A protein has these predicted regions:
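An N-terminal hydrophobic leader/cap segment in hydrolases
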Residues: 6-43
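Membrane-embedded segments
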Residues: 44-123, 131, 149
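Short alpha-helix in the alpha/beta-hydrolase fold that links the catalytic acid
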Residues: 82, 200, 209, 223-232
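Catalytic histidine neighborhood in serine/cysteine hydrolases
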Residues: 228-250
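Hydrolase active-site cap/lid region
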Residues: 147-203, 209, 253-255
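Gly/Ala-rich beta-loop-alpha elbow adjacent to hydrolase catalytic centers
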Residues: 137-141, 145
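Short beta-strand/loop motif that positions the catalytic acidic residue
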Residues: 206-208, 213-215, 219
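Acidic catalytic loop of the alpha/beta-hydrolase fold
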Residues: 218-222, 248-250
Length: 268
């Protein structure tokens, strides 16, 4: 029990509970005929980060660039397929690996990971000064995206935010997951040791740009109730909601949801 308490207490708990990085790439974008290049970034604390710049055909390039923040496990080699369709529609996408993921150095822990999102946005601003910046986050990446845009969105002129399967709070989503197992219910009271400083629902009211949120009622990882709690915290005039389909972070497998996101990008 003491070991569990040590795991859950303080910021270090977030590494164990929420981040499950993998160093090895399982595939690269060229396997899917996506042009890309390796990008190396430096976070404010000096941590070296890696990303893939996914590049569209020059003839269809859009005047928007997208910072893609993936989920809490594996790395960009398994997550980037979620956004290849955006590249095919002409959008340049920077797929970032947080510290400890893929080739990025360091250890994933909050709030340090928020510096990684900032580094990605800074690189895109410098590389594409005449393009509008959009942030897209899935699951854990959505939680990071909300925090980043709430704190730094104006500094980096972020124009739109897209969230898929976000959760409202770190404690609440941990509670939801622990309740699913017998062992989890035993340690459930220790959830209250988890810091709530970066709960997306508390940061959401500070977002004043258009936000599209997608969430499937079939999501077995992040319950739709978590997403709804976050959505309710967003400024009403800025938000739109898409009830998608499929398992966790699978909305973009469906063309109809891709088209809704594409329309949102064009309108913004």
């Amino acid at each position: 029990m003491l070991a569990v308490a040590a795991t859950l207490s303080g910021c270090a708990s977030l590494t164990t509970l929420y981040f499950h990085p993998q160093e090895i790439w399982l595939q690269t974008p060229d396997r899917f005929d996506i042009d890309y290049e390796d990008v190396w970034l430096t976070a404010d604390d000096g941590t070296e980060l890696h990303a893939w710049l996914l590049k569209p055909e020059p003839t269809i390039e859009q005047a928007k660039v997208i910072l893609y923040l993936h989920g809490n496990a594996e790395n960009i080699s398994t997550h980037s397929r979620s956004v290849f369709w955006l590249v095919e529609k002409g959008y340049t996408v920077l797929a970032l690996d947080y510290r400890g993921f893929g080739a990025s150095q360091g250890r994933p822990i909050l709030p340090d990971v928020l510096m990684d999102a900032k580094a990605g946005a800074s690189w895109l601003r410098d590389a594409y000064p005449d393009h509008s910046l959009v942030v897209l986050g899935q699951s854990m990446g959505a939680a990071l995206a909300v925090n980043f845009v709430a704190d730094y969105g104006r500094d980096y002129d972020v124009s739109q935010l897209i969230l898929e399967a976000p959760f409202a709070g770190f404690r609440s989503v941990a509670r939801e997951m622990l309740q699913r197992t017998v062992v989890g219910t035993i340690v459930l009271p220790l959830v209250y040791l988890i810091p709530s400083d970066w709960d997306p629902k508390d940061r959401a009211p500070n977002i004043h740009i258009p936000v599209m949120q997608l969430h499937s009622r079939m999501d077995e990882v992040v319950p739709v109730s978590e997403g709804q709690a976050l959505y309710d915290a967003l400024p009403e005039s800025m938000r739109c909601y898409v009830a998608s389909q499929g398992p966790h972070i699978a909305s973009f497998r469906y063309n109809k949801f891709r088209e809704q996101v594409a329309d949102f990008l064009v309108r913004g």
